[in-house]
A protein has these predicted regions:
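ABC family nucleotide-binding domain
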Residues: 2-5, 10-164
Length: 164
């Protein structure tokens, strides 16, 4: 099996020298292509911090995170931004949909930023919306749809760019 994620000896500290808090302590694991992984633990155990580090929202204090052979802990600036755009898809717990955009516009946003042609955006949004059963709500705003529909909009937005 091909490793798509390697987490090696990662640690994450918050604060300064006089008041350090260790959020993650020497975590190691691998994920192979096709595997599904659940992260479980008590409140405050570092689950969100771990996922924020893997998703490049936060940086590790020590250790390495390797995604598809690339050590993301070494990426910075434009290289990190490019990696996020092309390799990752994010689904946030609270959806992070933009209230001033319709469901269609929220889903299409990443493609618009990547300067994909309008007809290709329309094709891809409608295709994913059809697969997720949300075609009928594409013209609605986030405040007009249910929590489950918001989750599907967020899921569509995460996969619209075909992240690896």
């Amino acid at each position: 099996m091909k490793k798509i994620l390697e987490v090696k000896n990662i640690e994450k500290y918050y604060g300064n020298k006089s008041n350090l808090t260790k959020a993650i302590d020497n975590i190691n694991f691998d994920v192979n292509k096709g595997e599904f992984v659940g992260i479980m633990g008590a409140s405050g155990s570092g689950k969100t911090t771990l996922l924020n580090c893997i998703s490049t929202i936060d940086r590790v204090t020590a250790g390495h995170i390797i995604i598809n052979g690339e050590d993301i802990t070494k990426l910075k600036g434009n290289n990190l931004n490019k990696f996020r755009r092309e390799e990752l898809g994010f689904i946030f717990q609270d959806f992070n949909l933009l209230d001033t955009l319709t469901a269609y516009e929220n889903i299409a946003l990443a493609l618009t930023i990547q300067k994909v042609k309008a007809n290709e955006i329309d094709k891809r949004v409608n295709e994913i919306a059809g697969k997720l059963g949300i075609k009928e709500i594409l013209k609605k705003y986030p405040y007009q749809v249910s929590g489950g529909q918001k989750q599907r909009i967020a899921s569509a937005r995460a996969i619209i760019t075909n992240p690896k």
